[in-house]
Curated annotation (Swiss-Prot):
<feature type="disulfide bond">
    <location>
        <begin position="368"/>
        <end position="399"/>
    </location>
</feature>
<dbReference type="Pfam" id="PF21659">
    <property type="entry name" value="Flavi_E_stem"/>
</dbReference>
<keyword id="KW-1043">Host membrane</keyword>
<dbReference type="InterPro" id="IPR001157">
    <property type="entry name" value="Flavi_NS1"/>
</dbReference>
<keyword id="KW-0165">Cleavage on pair of basic residues</keyword>
<dbReference type="Pfam" id="PF01570">
    <property type="entry name" value="Flavi_propep"/>
</dbReference>
<dbReference type="Pfam" id="PF00948">
    <property type="entry name" value="Flavi_NS1"/>
</dbReference>
<dbReference type="GO" id="GO:0005576">
    <property type="term" value="C:extracellular region"/>
</dbReference>
<dbReference type="InterPro" id="IPR011998">
    <property type="entry name" value="Flavi_Glycoprot_E_cen/dimer"/>
</dbReference>
<feature type="disulfide bond">
    <location>
        <begin position="297"/>
        <end position="324"/>
    </location>
</feature>
<feature type="site" description="Cleavage; by host signal peptidase">
    <location>
        <begin position="127"/>
        <end position="128"/>
    </location>
</feature>
<dbReference type="InterPro" id="IPR013756">
    <property type="entry name" value="GlyE_cen_dom_subdom2"/>
</dbReference>
<feature type="disulfide bond">
    <location>
        <begin position="849"/>
        <end position="937"/>
    </location>
</feature>
<keyword id="KW-1162">Viral penetration into host cytoplasm</keyword>
<feature type="disulfide bond">
    <location>
        <begin position="1107"/>
        <end position="1110"/>
    </location>
</feature>
<feature type="disulfide bond">
    <location>
        <begin position="386"/>
        <end position="410"/>
    </location>
</feature>
<feature type="glycosylation site" description="N-linked (GlcNAc...) asparagine; by host">
    <location>
        <position position="924"/>
    </location>
</feature>
Length: 1198
């Protein structure tokens, strides 16, 4: 039985049975009802009524309301909407009846109505302004005018207009103007938000609001990523964290491509740790360190020590930004040379980009179908951007016919924020350098530049291209002279200084010019490509809105990741670039060598401090007053044995004054391990114990430990089972990694022959040792020594040793030996044969019939992988075979390129094993590599220069070089194997094919060149010495066959050897007489022509030769088939039918050599007709560099 709560409820403080209604404010209740309806909750009739209200007012209903509308059943909706229709009909009838009654009223009421209408017009006129636009009435309104009907009195009566635009704000620069069409009675408005009932008018209003900014486009401009700068830089690049992401991607790629090495690194990391946490950390660190060895060269100390030989009079320095060099030489004071600042002034503005724009004064002119094309008068103003189009017109928007009407919209473009690019002129760069002497520097004067200058111990000076040399007086220390080459610093032609907001960056020139943003030049005020920061929205019948994109500053900053940040105001401080100087020390002298030794007691004013560069600074206080006197200071290994160890950086330190308690700073370099710094003599001697971490052997073993941690990751090389040597290479790679560092530290100064002999000696001692442990130690050490002495291990980059005529790429050696022979230890390999086979298949389907190799190493690569490619093609049912023919003459170019693909062919173990023993059968279709040009595969259908070096790998007998497909099409040679150097009076341009040597003797001139083969790519400007202002007609080795565009590639009396014997093998170009011949200079000699061999077809020697204005000794080419002279040197009176001439022509087939306009068949020593002479030998009608000859330079050899 349920108990009712009636009784007990009476005695409660609050009677639950007699509670009143909740006290809610009426407006709050109305708000709750409306909000619930907007959310789609409530009676169906109310929901439909609210949707009808939104429909009549041209407002957008909420998503929840639309969802409820779609959920209503059809019968229920039709029932309510029919009742709405009946109610609307009743209202229409009532209005019609009211209109008839008003017409029957008298004149007094009519006058009252007229006065009321006039008052309304006057009230509206207070807010609305009327003017003219395009010959029609223009009304300017604000957001208060759109609530009711706008009545405009005209000569034809009242013109009532309705404006239902939702973007009306207050008047500002952001205005929009468009037409309100006339709608006849009974036509509903369609695709218009403004209309009138009597005549068309234009409406204008501002779009600004006081609560938010103007409407802007959601679209953004795509800005290409700048990428990492190629400059060596002392400061961090902008947004350098992007490198971390790329490095993680590289690590992942390395693990996928090197599963065996990754497993080995993980095993080593697991063995190193004593618990699971340490094991995980060590494993992650090893995997992260592994690919770093081939990432790039990182870490560079900002202080280097240079030791001059005894009696040296000069030393070459290379100063970089924020670097310091300490120069020590026997019998000379120690100098510190510091690059203080690199500054460029008077930057020239190149181009400005707009990254934030505003759009104002929008106007639209529309026409009905068949009434002509719309034309906006503002199109004539260059500050406006216009766009024409078509819209749907008809009765609902003021046109009598249905169809497409013309529309023309214009908007004014103005730039709010811009990024400015400026170029640096080489002549405006100045280098501020300071020189400091390690003399009697007191602690008060240390770092005090003005005090050191007063003591003639320091000097600052500025080096500019106009003043590259300076002599400094250093008081009693003598004087020092610096001859510098400012042009060897930053390549100003490749970079711009770009200022975005308050930040400035050093950006690549090509990236800057390719930015997809509006731009203008300094001499113009008009912006180009303005539409990139504007968006014309979808056009309506008579209206089209235009909005500007938001600020692109954030996108620019993100794209600039990797660029170098610089400081710019009126000048820019550079942190990149270098300055090469020759420091002449012949007039430097030590000060105080005749002083006596100090006899009183010294004390350490402060404890000796480590400088971080392996040296220690000691501040001494001298109690005596017998100065100036020399300081007896030495570093010893033991106090019982006073034999000096280490060395003094401050040469001949002395106390300069006679005042007591004077303080002096001395810098010295103690040995590794424990030592004592001893100051003074006899019983007044003091000492300080010093420990320098590490040792010579310890440093070697620490390097070995790092090598073990990097563990066989010299390049991004795959775990390669493609050849039988792959497994052995990986073992050798591990040996190199673990012991390579110690090997270079301990034996790096010896020749490889000495290293090999030491290894053989240790092996012999191991074989003959009786004790097993000693025997194993000798055998292991000797084996590692022999292996590391004979193998070629890899690094990245190329270096040149001019004196030994040696070029190293990685640690592989490319030697030009004394007998003029090339010995190369390089082996080119594709990234993977599977992907290369797919690339070949794809290229063949696209109409590429073959390839031309760029170099002999690429040709050898095709030969090496031919069979494996053919097996892959056969296994994947592709009727195609790769055929490699012997190259003929020089390596020619071709117009097409191979394109990259992510797809790969697959091959099983059985097919791979079979490919080692048997070559596959030839298919019906062929892909031809090199060989002579044939009708089946002409050069115009071949690909060339499609590969570039990705990384240097490892090999026991050769350095592996991994190739990948180029992403861009270029004619330049691969810069990864190019090295350039200048040392003393010798300059060299070199790669794996060329050794081009120039010497300085009054002027720079080409001395000799040795060619492993002749190729048809162009030498990149980034690896060219002294390349500014060079005319290609003066280049002896033509630019079209990889001749450097350098002033080192010139020689007085000779022009470009475009018709030299470049199709011969084993070419050596030098300046000497061919055996058994003589050359005379005479004006009666013939003009330039193709190079001629000094022996005829039958082997007869031609002894007499001449030239018009060449320099002697003459230019000659030594080849496997004989000796040839240059184009300026002609045979004297010889039967031309027996001459052997060069068939090479570096120009287009329709052109002639611009330096020899005589008869083409006349190559002998008589003049050959009237001609105009220039420099005694040049003869051409077009004039040097004239319009008809301008294109002669730059055609590739085909």
């Amino acid at each position: 039985m349920t108990k009712k709560p009636g009784g007990p409820g009476k005695n409660r403080a609050i009677n639950m049975l007699k509670r009143g209604l909740p006290r809610v404010f009426p407006l709050v209740g109305v708000k709750r009802v409306v909000m619930s309806l907007l959310d789609g909750r409530g009676p169906v009739r109310f929901v439909l009524a609210l949707i009808t209200f939104f429909k009549f007012t041209a407002l957008a209903p909420t998503k929840a309301l639309l969802g409820r509308w779609k959920a209503v059943e059809k019968s229920v909706a039709m029932k309510h909407l029919t009742s709405f229709k009946r109610e609307l009909g009743t209202l229409i009838d009532a209005v019609n009846k009211r209109g008839r009654k008003q017409n029957k009223r008298g004149g007094n009421e009519g006058s009252i109505m007229w006065l009321a209408s006039l008052a309304v017009v006057i009230a509206y006129a207070g807010a609305m302004k009327l003017s003219n636009f395009q010959g029609k009435l223009l009304m300017t309104i604000n957001n208060t005018d759109i609530a009711d009907v706008i009545v405009i009195p005209t000569s034809k009566g009242e013109n009532r207009c309705w404006v239902r635009a939702i973007d009306v704000g207050y008047m500002c620069e952001d205005t929009i103007t468009y037409e309100c069409p006339k709608l006849t009675m009974g036509n509903d408005p369609e695709d218009v938000d403004c209309w009138c009932d009597n005549q068309e008018v234009y409406v204008q209003y501002g779009r600004c609001t006081r609560t938010r900014h103007s409407k802007r486009s959601r679209r953004s401009v795509s800005v290409q990523t700048h990428g990492e700068s190629s400059l060596v830089n002392k400061k961090e690049a902008w947004l350098d964290s992007t490198k971390a992401t790329r490095y993680l991607m590289k690590t992942e790629n390395w693990i996928i491509r090197n599963p065996g090495y990754a497993f080995l690194a993980a095993t080593l990391g697991w063995m190193l740790g004593s618990n699971n946490g340490q094991r995980v950390v060590f494993t992650i660190l090893l995997l992260l360190v592994a690919p770093a060895y081939s990432f790039n060269c990182l870490g560079m100390g900002n202080r280097d020590f240079i030791e001059g030989a005894s009696g040296a009079t000069w030393v070459d320095l290379v100063l970089e930004g924020d670097s310091c060099l300490t120069i020590m030489a026997n019998d000379k004071p120690t100098l510190d040379v510091r690059m203080i600042n690199i500054e460029a002034s008077q930057l020239a503005e190149v181009r400005s980009y707009c990254y934030h724009a505003s759009v104002t004064d929008i106007s639209t002119v529309a026409r009905c179908p068949t009434t002509g094309e719309a034309h906006n008068e503002k199109r004539a103003d260059s500050s406006y951007v216009c766009k024409q189009g078509f819209t749907d017109r008809g009765w609902g928007n003021g046109c009598g016919l249905f169809g497409k009407g013309s529309i023309d919209t214009c908007a004014k473009f103005s730039c709010t924020s811009k990024a400015i690019g400026r170029t640096i002129q080489p002549e405006n760069i100045k280098y501020e350098v300071g020189i400091f002497v390690h003399g009697t520097t007191t602690s008060e004067n240390h770092g005090n530049y003005s005090a050191q200058v007063g003591a003639s111990q320091a000097a600052k000076f500025t080096i500019t291209p106009n003043a590259p040399s300076i002599t400094l007086k250093l008081g009693d220390y003598g004087e020092v002279t610096l001859d510098c080459e400012p042009r060897s610093g930053l390549n100003t032609e490749a970079f711009y200084v770009m200022t975005v907001g308050s930040k400035s960056f050093l950006v690549h020139r090509e990236w800057f010019h390719d930015l997809a943003l509006p731009w203008t030049s300094p001499s113009s005020t008009a912006w180009r490509n303005r539409e990139l920061l504007m968006e014309f929205e979808e056009a309506h019948a008579t209206k089209q809105s235009v909005v500007a994109l938001g600020s692109q500053e954030g996108g620019l900053h993100q794209a600039l990741a990797g660029a170098i940040v610089v400081e710019y105001s009126s000048s820019v401080k550079l942190t990149s670039g270098h300055l090469k100087c020759r420091l002449k020390m012949d007039k430097l002298a030590l000060k105080g060598t005749t002083y006596g030794m100090c006899t009183e007691k010294f004390s350490f004013a402060k404890n000796p401090a480590d400088t971080g560069h392996g040296t220690v600074v000691i501040e001494l206080s001298y109690s005596g007053s017998d100065g100036p006197c020399k300081i007896p200071i030495v570093s010893v290994a033991s106090l019982n044995d006073m034999t000096p160890v280490g060395r003094l950086v401050t040469v001949n330190p002395f106390v300069a004054t006679s005042s007591a308690n004077s303080k002096v700073l001395v810098e010295m370099e103690p040995p590794f391990g424990d030592s004592y710094i001893v100051v003074g003599r006899g019983d007044k001697q003091i000492n300080h114990h010093w420990h320098k971490a590490g040792s010579t052997l310890g440093k070697a073993f620490s390097t070995t430990l790092k090598g073990a941690q990097r563990l066989a990751a010299l390049g991004d090389t795959a775990w390669d089972f493609g050849s039988i040597g792959g497994v052995f290479n990986s073992i050798g790679k591990a040996v190199h990694q673990v012991f390579g560092g110690a090997f270079r530290t301990l034996f790096g100064g010896m020749s490889w022959i000495t290293q090999g002999l030491m290894g053989a000696l240790l092996l012999w001692m191991g074989v003959n040792a009786r004790d097993r442990s000693i025997a194993l130690a000798f055998l292991a050490t000797g084996g590692v020594l022999v292996f590391l002495a004979t193998n070629v291990h890899a690094d990245t980059g190329c270096a040149i040793d001019i004196t030994r005529k040696e070029m190293r790429c990685g640690s592989g050696i490319f030697v030009h030996n004394d007998v003029e022979a090339w010995v190369d230890r390089y082996k080119y390999l594709p990234e993977t044969p599977r992907s290369l086979a797919k690339i070949v298949h794809k290229a063949h389907k696209e109409g590429v019939c073959g390839v031309r190799s760029v170099t002999r190493l690429e040709h050898q690569m095709w030969e090496a992988v031919r069979d494996e490619l053919n097996v892959l093609l056969k296994e994947n049912a592709v009727d195609l075979s790769v055929v490699v023919n012997k190259p003929v003459g020089r390596y020619r170019s071709a117009p097409k390129r191979l394109s990259m693909t992510q797809e790969k062919f697959e091959m099983g173990w059985k097919a791979w094993g079979k490919s080692i023993l048997f070559a596959p059968e030839l298919a019906n279709s062929t892909f031809v590599v090199d060989g002579p040009e044939t009708k089946e595969c002409p050069d115009e259908h071949r690909a060339w220069n499609s590969m570039q070096i990705e990384d240097f790998g490892f090999g026991i007998t050769s350095t592996r070089v991994w190739l990948k497909i180029r992403e861009e099409s270029t004619d330049e040679c691969d810069g990864a194997i190019i090295g350039t150097a200048v040392k003393g009076h010798v300059a060299v341009h070199s790669d794996l094919s060329y050794w081009i040597e120039s010497r300085y003797n009054d002027t720079w001139k080409l001395e000799r060149a040795v060619f492993g083969e002749v190729k048809s790519c162009t030498w990149p400007e980034t690896h060219t010495l002294w390349g500014d202002g060079v005319e290609e007609s003066e280049l002896i080795i033509p630019h079209t066959i990889a001749g450097p565009k350098s002033k080192h590639n010139r020689r007085e009396g000779y022009k470009t050897q475009n018709q030299g014997p470049w199709d011969e093998n084993g070419i050596v170009l030098d300046f000497d007489y061919c055996p058994g011949t003589k050359v005379t200079i005479t004006e009666d000699c013939g003009k330039r022509g193709p190079s001629v061999r000094t022996t005829t077809d039958s082997g007869k020697l031609i002894t007499d030769w001449c030239c018009r204005s060449c320099s002697l000794p003459p230019l000659r080419f030594r080849t496997e088939n004989g000796c040839w002279y240059g184009m300026e040197i002609r045979p004297v009176r010889h039967d031309e039918t027996t001459l052997v001439r060069s068939q090479v022509d570096a120009f287009n087939g329709e052109m002639v050599d611009p330096f020899s306009a005589g008869p083409s068949g006349d190559v002998s020593g008589h003049p050959g007709g009237p001609s105009q002479e220039v420099d005694g030998q040049i003869d051409h009608s077009c004039g040097f560099g004239g319009p008809t000859c301008a294109d002669a330079w730059g055609h590739h050899l085909h």
